[in-house]
Amino acid sequence: MDACESIQETSTIMKARFHLIFMLILPCMAAAQLAPDIHPARFGALTLYFENDAFGSTDRDYTNGVRLSWTSPSLQRFSDDPTAGRVAGVFDDAPWFGDSSYERNVAISIGQSMFTPVDVRNPALVPSERPYAAWLYVGLGLVWKKTNVKNTLLFNIGVIGPWALGEESQRLVHDALGQRSPQGWDNQLRNEVGVNVTYERKWRLHHNPASSGMDWDFLPYVGATLGNVYTHGTLGGELRFGYNLPDDFGTGAISDSATTSTPLEGSTKAWAHRFGWHLFARAEGRAVARNIFLDGNTFRDSHSVDKKPFVADLSLGFAVNWRNSKLSYAYIYRTCEFKGQPDEQIFGSITLSIFF
């Protein structure tokens, strides 16, 4: 395939994927417009995350991620949640979850992430490139927060390998878009149960919950993840500037601590009743001790590459909130994750939250 054919194929693929994304989001936005004006803290939030490297005109490395989560309204106790209260309620009396002045949320989620080498048309294993891999998981998140600080504890459990249905998912998408099917999934990581626990603490600086009009705030955070899928420490921050900023803690990309950030019950700014927008810039660094998608299987021999100990993500994006919905898009640049990786990666992230 010459350069012109490659550019034309990439353009066709991107147009098809944008059309598919639009068709997925349109019904959700229609539902948001039909719903009455609400204060989002008093209702739960359904959030769809979609990430794909087609926004960066590539088809490699972290190639696709999707996640659907439900976050409860603000609660006094985790056990008050009708969905997962029986499980989450065991943490109600733990001293490190704060006193009665904290508002709480319970989040449940399901997601899948896929990773591929550079050439998905090559059926052979290429030792210098990352392994084929997929991660299919469910999560339980516990959030306890005050006006200017939010804590998140997240438990993810799932499967890596053929059980994660990465090959089937990628073939389904490629067939829907008229692309050639990937050929190398026979070389993917072997089946393994994955368990991860993540804690994150986030602050809000220069935040005025009663403000309207143009404003800005800054959301620094630290976190740690432990498990056989990922083990790393995280340090990052998000700067927001815009009109009628939502009274929340931002909306990040798919990550170990991604839970929908519902506003505080006591907020005086019911931003669901009005239109707002903002631009944001986010930077995150991770000190990586383990990444199963680079290190390979934990308990058996498998394809692996030499990971880099430090990885950074830089993001630019915008978000719009109106009535009971919030839509955001981020363009994410990720530094090289392993030795010999030909280039850094760029991918896009779309997040849609509907409060009801």
Which role does the model predict for each range below?
Residues 90-166:
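Long, hydrophobic/aromatic-enriched structural stretches that serve as scaffold segments
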Residues 33-78, 105-111, 115-120, 288-294:
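Short glycine/proline- and aromatic-enriched beta-strand/turn motifs that initiate or cap beta-hairpins
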Residues 51-55, 115-119, 160-164, 204-208, ...:
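Sequence/structural signature of outer-membrane beta-barrel proteins
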Residues 123-128, 181-187, 223, 300-304, ...:
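Extracellular loop and loop/strand-boundary signature of outer-membrane beta-barrel proteins
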Residues 60-66, 132-136, 151, 191-197, ...:
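Residues that define the transmembrane beta-barrel architecture of outer-membrane proteins
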Residues 45, 118-119, 238, 243-356:
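Outer membrane beta-barrel transmembrane domains
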Residues 33-43, 74-104, 145-152, 205-218, ...:
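Short loop/turn motifs that connect adjacent beta-strands in outer-membrane beta-barrel proteins
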Residues 46-52, 106-114, 155-161, 201, ...:
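Transmembrane beta-barrel strands of outer-membrane/channel proteins
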